[in-house]
C-alpha cells in the first residue's frame, strides 16, 4: 500500500516576503536562495539584477542574535520570542505568534532592526 503525502511546506521566503526584507534594508547577499526570472526557485544566491533574493528559515534565524540584554532567543513551532529568566518568572522582551514561521521571523527581524539589535553587517549602508 502506497502512502501519498501532500506536503505544502514553505522552503524559502515568498517574493512578497523577500521584497519586505529588502525594504527593511537586508543585503541581498545575505540570501541563500533566489527566485530567478520566470518564477523558478534556485538554491543559489542571486546573481542577476532580475533575480529576487530568497531566504530559508534557517538563514533568517541564523541572522538573529542568540541573546540580547539578558534575553535568549526562543523558537517554538508557532512563535519566536526573546525571553529572560528572572527570579520568579519569565520576562518576554518580544514575542510574535502565528501560523507562518516565515512571517514570524520577518516580524522579529523588523523589530530587531527597529530596536537596534540586528547585526548591521547584514544591512545595507544608509
Task: Go through each PLM region and give its residues.
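Glycine-rich anion-binding surface patch
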Residues: 1-126
